[in-house]
């Protein structure tokens, strides 16, 4: 089979039994199981959740998005070989480490295949929980233009690009478009302060005011666990985005959990430690792909200017990126995953067929 065949680009057409529309995100697709199948799996697989918990099959793809667009390569390559399996493997590793360190649970109940999670339904917090240890990216661009207050936090004068910040900063933004919140524009991905969240905690999805402290603790503790583990393999954990939600446990109590992915090259910046000590930035995350795109196209403003979104979408749709650029991203993702987990990343020749086979034979979920 060709390299293109090994890439799972379309992940919303699997014949999984469901009575709800498939939810397709930029990278993952979610298939909500029927009530009968959810109850059957909870019983037969022994998942530690209430018997009426809705379950979903979450299938990751190898697609790559940047600047809110999906990009593709030469030779019919619609994604990055190994990317999906690498992202899941990294998240699985960090969630396991979180559990070992006594942090919160995640939404994942089972991992049938490197591309697949079985997850429990959660009530999401409508906050992108962003943590920054270094000043770079959008924060540096704003700081260099004179901004000093970020999400209600005042930064000192004299900071330099890419330097370590005096303390770990929490700089949240809105998740989705939220309306009716004083002082918060009804736009996706708007920076907010802790005081914004406190004053409107229920609108942001928090069940109790004190859970804001818990979310910040889980964010900082999770960051520190990953940062320490990455330092052990000479990688620098620069910044990251976590997501949180509530689930109901077997005793009927709400508990805050980690959701989505954590500490991956998609959701984080990761730098090579040796290069950083040498005064250079070597990206081991999607940031390297973003920088490639900014250098590859003659007018990078198309990628940065939100007012030029139609042009940007056409740019992504109409241009096949060089194969070597796509494979460099593949090497970055699989390389980080193998360093983090200490194990090779499986690259199945036909992942879709493998997923269908496992979900049919071991879970009886294929129609």
From Swiss-Prot:
CDD domains: SAICAR_synt_Sc (cd01414). Its EC number is 6.3.2.6. Keywords: ATP-binding, Ligase, Nucleotide-binding, Purine biosynthesis. GO terms for molecular function: ATP binding; phosphoribosylaminoimidazolesuccinocarboxamide synthase activity. It comes from the Bacteria. It catalyses: 5-amino-1-(5-phospho-D-ribosyl)imidazole-4-carboxylate + L-aspartate + ATP = (2S)-2-[5-amino-1-(5-phospho-beta-D-ribosyl)imidazole-4-carboxamido]succinate + ADP + phosphate + 2 H(+). One of its GO terms (biological process) is 'de novo' IMP biosynthetic process. One of its GO terms (cellular component) is cytoplasm. Pathway: Purine metabolism; IMP biosynthesis via de novo pathway; 5-amino-1-(5-phospho-D-ribosyl)imidazole-4-carboxamide from 5-amino-1-(5-phospho-D-ribosyl)imidazole-4-carboxylate: step 1/2. Belongs to the SAICAR synthetase family. This is Phosphoribosylaminoimidazole-succinocarboxamide synthase.
